[in-house]
A protein has these predicted regions:
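Basic, nucleic-acid-interacting segments
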Residues: 1-303, 320, 341-345
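Core structural elements
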Residues: 196-208, 276, 313-337, 346-363, ...
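Strongly charged, low-complexity linkers/loops
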Residues: 369-379, 383, 389-460
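Amphipathic alpha-helical core segments of compact helical bundles
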Residues: 23, 238, 333, 354-362, ...
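M16/insulysin-pitrilysin zinc metalloprotease superfamily fold
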Residues: 342-343, 349, 357-372, 380-385, ...
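C-terminal non-catalytic interaction appendages of large macromolecular assemblies
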Residues: 150-155, 193-200, 209-212, 418-481
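Residue-level detector of well-ordered alpha-helical segments, enriched
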Residues: 322, 335, 345-353, 377, ...
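Structural motif
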Residues: 8, 317-318, 340-349, 387-390, ...
């Protein structure tokens, strides 16, 4: 049974806990550095290893990042907050507890708008709080040994917790993609999932359709790709549906995603909710921020993707799909806005940026870089086509030359065989019609589809340098005579 069939009888209740590793120069509570590719246990210090007598210090850069995120999601930013110890035992947690936040997080509430099935949904947040990351365990089943790399231990994280308002696995995937987009826009994390910088825990329960009652919740831990977020939740929904249809009870459980088997597998059954025995960290005093400090940080938050999307749909009349492509990164959005600011039609700008320019970057398999084709050069190119100085096809060749050579557009237009101003279109059309008398007679007798044949013949003569509109207009006029 597929997800949509299950959804006819059951409501899906999904909440996410997303961990984003912040791009700070040092760890959350020490001056120790963290970089992904360093050799194991080469970036550690007494604090990140939990050695006796080592005292933590709060990373100010992490606090600034959290304030920016709070502003981006319209959450309540607390001037006063505390850190707490979250106790659990695992080899990658050397202190026996994690420094996190409990009843006084830095960010409360807020929401994140997403698009799903071409409708806007606001995903409400419970909170976002700062904490330190754990180390990383490596299990070798052949040697029956486990190793731990403590380089990541103590790295700065922001954990984003949603309300249980996500109603479909695909929504969960889209929400996680939006979080990555937001943290990229505000420049607090590159959120590279392949490096573990964006991870997700998913809480799932099923409720009888329309009952409004929560079912028994299970949790899938450490999902590390957008595709797997959706697949893991779907797998757990299918499992819970089977249990409930067999008139059995779902048990509280912690699961992990097995990518090889394409299924979420139970790690352990929980009889009760986890008791982490939170209490305020005695080594970290309460933090109190000045209002002016918070306001300064908030003022640095740029225009966000959902702001661009609404503006472009309302003011530029672009489609949702166009807007989502153009807002996919801050650099692309700013580039598009710059092109439009040069008095280029938003529709034309959208087509050239999201279709033609993107094609060139995709061919090179490189990220968008506005310096490859400057906005002012793209404006000149679009204007040349608008004035029928060059054809759209020639424009694509000019764009490629700009992209590949970095030359000035004026130089490319002069050196290339693009200009159609010296072509006598009327003379060429007369020649084509003179050579195709039989086709002209057939056209005049009602075979109007032959217009395509004539256009093709003219384009052969002009090598496609004359605009389609001019060719059609001239041909239509001549064929009426």
């Amino acid at each position: 049974m597929n997800i949509n069939d299950i959804n006819k009888n059951w409501d899906f209740i999904i909440g996410l806990e997303i961990h984003v590793q912040l791009d700070c120069n040092s760890k959350m509570f020490s001056n120790c550095q963290y970089e992904y590719d360093n050799s194991p246990n080469s970036l550690t210090c007494p604090t990140s290893l939990g050695l006796p007598g080592a005292l933590p210090n709060v990373n100010q850069s992490a606090i600034e990042s959290a304030i920016m995120f709070g502003k981006a999601v319209n959450g309540k930013i607390s001037k006063n907050f505390t850190f707490a110890r979250k106790h659990y035992f695992y080899p990658d947690l050397p202190k026996g507890y994690q420094i996190s936040q409990f009843d006084q997080p830095i960010i409360s509430g807020g929401s994140v708008p997403i698009w799903w099935n071409e409708k806007e949904f606001k995903i409400d947040l419970t909170r976002a709080h700062l904490e330190e990351d754990a180390g990383k365990s490596f299990h070798n089943n052949d040697s029956k040994k486990s190793n731990v790399d403590y380089n990541r231990s103590g790295a700065a994280l922001i954990e984003i917790v949603t309300e249980p308002v996500i109603v479909h696995p695909e929504q969960a995937k889209i929400f996680m993609q939006r979080i990555k987009q937001i943290v990229n826009y505000i420049n607090i994390s590159n959120a590279e999932m392949e490096k573990g910088k964006l991870r997700c825990d998913a809480n799932i329960s099923l409720s009888k359709k329309g009952s409004g009652k929560f079912g028994v919740k299970t949790e899938i831990k450490n999902i590390n790709s957008f595709r797997n977020v959706q697949k893991a939740i779907e797998s757990e929904i299918i499992r819970q549906n089977k249990i409930l249809n067999d008139r059995k009870e779902v048990q509280q459980a912690t699961l992990t995603w097995n990518n090889d088997k394409n299924v979420a597998e139970i790690m352990r059954i929980k009889e009760n909710a986890d008791d982490y025995r939170y209490f305020p960290d005695p080594d970290l005093p309460p933090v109190s921020l000045e209002k002016s400090f918070i306001e300064d940080i908030k003022s640095s938050v740029p225009i966000l993707p959902f702001d661009y999307e609404k503006k472009w749909m309302n003011e530029y009349n672009l489609s949702l799909n166009e807007c989502m492509i153009l807002s996919s990164s801050k650099d692309i959005a700013k580039y598009f806005e710059e092109v439009v600011s040069l008095d280029v039609s938003p529709k034309k700008a959208s087509t050239w940026v999201s279709t033609e320019l993107f094609r060139l970057f995709n061919e090179m398999n490189t990220a968008f870089d506005s310096s490859k084709v400057e906005a002012k050069d793209l404006k000149i190119l679009i204007d040349e086509i608008k004035r029928n100085k060059i054809t759209p096809n020639s424009g694509k060749e000019v764009l490629r030359a700009l992209f590949e050579t970095g030359k000035n557009i004026s130089e490319i237009l002069k050196s290339g065989d693009f200009d159609s101003s010296d072509i006598n279109t009327t003379e060429i059309i007369d020649k084509v019609l003179s050579n195709c008398q039989n086709e002209v007679l057939r056209y005049k007798k009602g075979e109007e589809k032959l217009i395509g044949f004539f256009i093709g013949q003219v384009n052969k003569e002009t090598k496609g340098k004359v605009s389609h509109e001019i060719v059609i207009a001239e041909l239509s006029k001549k064929l009426k005579d």
